[in-house]
Amino acid sequence: MLRPWFCFRSCVSLLSNRRQYGFRYLATAEPSKSEKPAKPVKPAKPMSVQEKKMRLGQDQFRKELEERISKIPIQNYRNFSIVAHVDHGKSTLSDRLLELTGVIEPGSKSQVLDKLDVERERGITVKAQTVSMLYTEPASGQDYLLHLVDTPGHVDFRAEVSRSYASCGGALLLVDASQGVQAQTVANFFLAYSMDLKLIPIINKIDLDLANIPRAMEQVETTFELDPADCIPVSAKTGLNVEKIIPSIIKNIPAPVGDESRPLKALLVDSWHDPYVGVVMLVHVVDGKLKKGTKLLSAHTNKTYDVKEVGIMYPDRTPMEYIKAGQVAYVIPGMKNPREALVGDTFFQLGKSEGLDPLPGFEEPQPMVFVGAFPSEGKDFSIMDDSIQNLVLNDRSVHLEKETSNALGSGWRLGFLGSLHASVFKERLEKEYGAKIILTAPTVPYKIVFKNGDEKIITNPDEFPDNKMHNLVSHYMEPYVETIMTLPNEYVGTVMQLCLSNRGEQKEVEYLNTGQTLLRYDIPMAQLVEDFFGKLKGCTKGYASLDYEDAGYRKSDIVKMELCVNGEPQDALTTIVHKSIAQAKGKEYVTRFKKFLRYQLFEVAIQARVNNKVIARETIKAKRKDVTQKLHAADISRYKKLLERQKEGKKQMKAVGRINIGNDAYQAFLRRDN
């Protein structure tokens, strides 16, 4: 027998949802002003992880979670990532998916996957992260285990991107409805496409006034050859239509292929250093099971480790009894040296690796941008050395060695994957450790080919062959990159001129149907690291986007340019440039450096030299002291005698005098805004 209150609620539900049930014109009585309208019943939302932990307790929560995951077959696993340009809403969309699956509470924390402060402030991803989600399909009631692998989007971190994609079966291709397809989206699309990932196009930010959904869909079709009917228009900010994404992931992205009964094989996706537990590895378990106490063997270093803990990120580290094939999870291997964690390495179980081949695609990341780093105050060297060593623990791709400069004292030679990587490292050093650092002008790895066939890579201008060694050199080579730029049509001419002035070679010009142009240029890496992106943004009023990839080495006519003050080379300001721009660069250097030197009692010559030949010069006139101010106007002989004595004194001072250049002068000169 139905209770009266149940019948009443059913009627209210039917009346309030008359459009859904086909009663479009069903009349309803207007409520009187004295009556308050009934509040709509909100649909039940999944209980968040924090609520479950509080209600069940930590141990019971973990036990129930393990039991639930153990019942999910690998056919119900889905591993995916999000491909997006900077500021297209990747982190916001990730938060909405986590809220939808109950991993976090709505509005509890933004940008869950961006762990570093610099990631939150810049809106970029530097370290690959993952989070696991549990989703129950309403129609069948089946549980699904979803692994969202958050990847860096910038080319500087391409090694992490490719390893992350290798652990996924598909990706969400995120496009901003107001901006359309951008360069970074194009570059990462082709990388994902080359790795056979199933792509689901998502049109984001449809709530904006400038949103143009048909144009964005057309771009997706023309640029990526994807069916616009498959596009899901959403607003990650408001959550509109986000609930349609997970069913699409389950339907379109294939489950990972693996067998937990086979011997263990795990791919290292990324790693970081935790001050309490040491190295934490993010791995994709391809085959087998992995649990605490397992002895791991690295395929590339041949070193062994005892596993201290395994688990999933839910959203933070949640220990599990074991992890198995198909999962993307974390492992604490008891590794003491973080530099042994090689991204792309394969791990086996010790004693069960015979006949097993490492997973393909491993490559050691090669630094492409090198800078000299020095403390702004020499006394801070030991403190800053500890800070840099600690930061390098979390970033194994940084090349580090100590060096000494005659001008700036003791410091370090740092190698980075790119200019953004260097900028992020410097920012983290300053904000996390309060360090004040001077970075020299960036240089790239040049190749010297000798006449006897030997080759040598140099990353420091001091290693450039001197005049005595020139006869042994056959030729020099410098690295090039293939750039991809997207920009509005009206700026095409300006950007082409910019590329030409930076020794660029045009490869392709494609006019898109949406008022945008896609340009491909081969540009020397040395030109790219000299704030090429800043100049590109400046000449397009911020509307251009840029991405690039390695294009190998090419023969080049490069020279070493020295900046000398009174004949003494300043090693901190020595650089390698192309011969065609050496004179212009030399003139720029001497003119700029003159601004930061103080007047002396003797004349100071600032020169730019190439092969001991002066190509540019600026002079700081001597500071004049009036030695005749106390003389009578008629005493001409005494007047001339004092001036001659002053002249001789200045001549002698110039011969033996030395100019002291403070660190503040070098720091001001090396700042990008100068």
Swiss-Prot record:
**Gene3D superfamilies noted in UniProt:** 3.30.70.240, Elongation factor 4, C-terminal domain, Elongation Factor G (Translational Gtpase), domain 3, P-loop containing nucleotide triphosphate hydrolases, Translation factors
The record's subcellular locations are: Mitochondrion inner membrane
Q: Does the keyword Membrane apply?
A: yes
GO terms under cellular component: mitochondrial inner membrane; mitochondrial matrix
Q: What are the entry keywords?
A: GTP-binding, Hydrolase, Membrane, Mitochondrion, Mitochondrion inner membrane, Nucleotide-binding, Protein biosynthesis, Transit peptide
Gene Ontology molecular function, alphabetical: GTP binding; GTPase activity; mitochondrial ribosome binding
Q: Region Disordered: which residues?
A: 32-51
What is the main EC category here?
hydrolase
Describe the reaction catalysed, as an equation. GTP + H2O = GDP + phosphate + H(+)
Q: Which amino acids does the record list as binding GTP?
A: 84-91, 150-154, 204-207
What processes does the entry annotate via GO biological process terms? positive regulation of translation; translation
Transit peptide feature, positions = 1-33
User: Which Pfam family, giving just one, matches this sequence?
Assistant: GTP_EFTU
Topology in the lipid bilayer: Peripheral membrane protein
Protein family membership: Belongs to the TRAFAC class translation factor GTPase superfamily. Classic translation factor GTPase family. LepA subfamily.
What protein does this entry describe? Answer: Translation factor GUF1, mitochondrial
Organism ancestry: Eukaryota, Fungi, Dikarya, Ascomycota, Saccharomycotina
Q: Which gene encodes it?
A: GUF1
